[in-house]
Amino acid sequence: METVSRSSFQPHAGLQKTLEQFHLSSMSSLGGPAAFSARWTQDLYKKECGKEPPEPILHLPSQPPPVIPGGPLFMPSDRSTERCETILEGETISCFVVGGEKRLCLPQILNSVLRDFSLQQINAVCDELHVYCSRCTADQLEILKVMGILPFSAPSCGLITKTDAERLCNALMYGGSYPPRCAKKSDFPPGPLELELTEGSFKVYHECFGKCRGLFVPELYGHPSAPCIQCLDCRLMYPPHKFVVHSHKALENRTCHWGFDSANWRAYILLARDGVGGDDELARLGRLLEEIKEKFDYSNKYKRKAARLSSEPVAKKAKADDSIIHSPSSAEKDKSSSWLRNLSNINKNAGYVHPRQRLSAFRPWSPAISANDKELSTHLPALIRDSFYNYKSFENLVAPNVALTPPVQQKVITSPPCVPAVPRSTQSSGSPPQSRKRRPTAELPIVPEAPAPPVPIREEEKESETEIEVESREECTFTSSLSSLSSPSFTSSSSAKELSSPGMLAPTVINTSYEVASHNDQHCSGLEAELEHLKQALDSGLDSKEAKEKFLHEVVKMRVKQEEKLNAALQAKRSLQQELEFLRVAKKEKLREATEAKRNLRKEIERLRAEHEKKMKEANESRLRLKRELEQARQIRVCDKGCEAGRIRVKYSAQIEELQSKLQHAENDREQLRTDLVHEREAREHLEKVVKDLQEQLWSKTSHLPSSEHTRKDIEN
């Protein structure tokens, strides 16, 4: 387990100067806010006030500062691919958490929240506010495509921070302007844009995006989105979460804003001190503002935060009768490293801070040094263990994308395992709170400490320490006051040797070293010093030598049990590390399989799309061909109809002419037959006449009757 003492680390002068320069430059850069602004703003406020309160000092012997190689190391930017969602103007937007700041998908914002605005308007506002749009990585682009947020044909995607998205939406959708009757020196009579002065109204302000002052009207705060704050510049009413974005000054357009969220307006709106009668009135308005902030706080975040702040005491001053006197060199050294101690206490101390200490309301909180009401236990393992967790919290405070090179050597100062119970007034007020109280078994004289050898820092342990520190801490908690005498590298064989050694009777002080938890346990040389302190306790509290030996044997047994517990905890830690590594490998494998499946799916979709386009092209060509054939058939049909009528007309005309000719021939034949009949009638009449003449001749010739009959028959024939 890593044992890095927060108080023993002494910063190099060049490193401290580099950190101060980084703090000044990071306010206007894209790397995030200054993570080291807490102590810097406190020193600035103390210099302005002209008084320097006493700082809490851990009473440790002086030692030379370690060698710090080089300056800051700028590491690669955070390329996180874990997709999450956030709410922006009532719309759910996909985002990635990069460097602690949410990066929102810009195309999704344009298509949902800002769909009523043109690209020219959006670009103009982005140029005015200096909104920076970064390009997403290839993995982030693939995730957005797989989730269906972006089309597969999208070549890239822009990402903007949640803070810039809030500023952009506020400027486009809720941008206030100066009404014609809101000038500071106006000669117009009072109108509807006057201040909403009521009995409970009071002035507030915020320091976000250039600052703004307003008048809070509690009577109008009927629901979370009620416009209850009136801007003192434009006289327009805004709800609290919109007032913190509202501003009429372009003072911070070139500042990198980081970590802003309008949902946290309760932390941004502050009470204005001008126009307040006295301290009582100021306290009353402060309580009223706190009550208003707790109203409609459904998640109870602000209530929990306020309760946590009120439960911790304010920093106490050291009493004048302090019996411990520090040398000028140690005081100077503690003063130079005070900024590091305060940084490690940020997660534990959150006392009251004067508003002048904060340059902006949404920048990291600058806590004052608060005193701990618990008793201080100076036992080294517990101190190192708590310092280790504070060191881990200190690592998380570094600004995103920027890391500092760790020192090559870090030293830990040992302390006696048992110290006499001292009054609270003589304890250090700035000591980190322990996990539990420990009662010393006997009154012991204070033994001077000796510097410890350097402790190596293993990079492989730093990587996985964050994931399992909670489990390791639960398994490694000590269950009694005597159990705090154990060390990670103690063994039963060495303890037996020390018990049988006659040199135990001589009071000696041995240097001890505490190593970082690793795969190979090393023997510790601090057993002699601890047993010497135990002998002093036995000499002062036990009479017989047998009782002392029995007490020492009990202590050794207890330490062996604790070592077994520690080994079991280390084994559990290793197993958890292996399981975590297995989960990481499995996650990478699943991600690779998902990526491969996505690529195959995309290829299949592209193939189906190509086939569909080909079939659609063929269908369109077939449709056009059939359409042309249909038109040709229609034209042919129309032509055929016209030609057939002509042919029928010609045919019928020919037939009519033929019939007419036939009729003419028939008429001619009829005339010819009529003529023939006339000729035949005439011939018949002539014949009848001849016959009649012959009959007459026959009648006249009666004598020749047979011959005449025969002649008549011949004539008839």
UniProtKB/Swiss-Prot annotation:
It comes from the Eukaryota. Signal peptide: none annotated. Sequence repeats lie at residues 527-550, 551-575, 576-600, 601-625. Residues 527-625 are annotated as: 4 X 25 AA approximate tandem repeats. High levels of the protein are found in the lungs and ovary with intermediate levels of expression in the heart, spleen and brain. Low expression levels are found in the liver, kidney, testis, intestine and blood while no expression is found in muscle, skin, stomach, eyes or nerves. It holds the Pfam family c-SKI_SMAD_bind. GO terms for cellular component: cytoplasm; nucleus; transcription regulator complex. It is found in: Nucleus. Residues 477-495 have a biased composition (Low complexity). One of its GO terms (biological process) is negative regulation of BMP signaling pathway. Residues 524-700 form a coiled coil. Residues 424-434 have a biased composition (Polar residues). Residues 707-717 have a biased composition (Basic and acidic residues). Keywords: Coiled coil, Nucleus, Proto-oncogene, Repeat. One of its GO terms (molecular function) is RNA polymerase II cis-regulatory region sequence-specific DNA binding. Residues 415-502, 698-717 are annotated as: Disordered. The keyword Coiled coil applies. Belongs to the SKI family. May play a role in terminal differentiation of skeletal muscle cells but not in the determination of cells to the myogenic lineage. May function in TGF-beta signaling. This is Ski oncogene. The gene is ski.
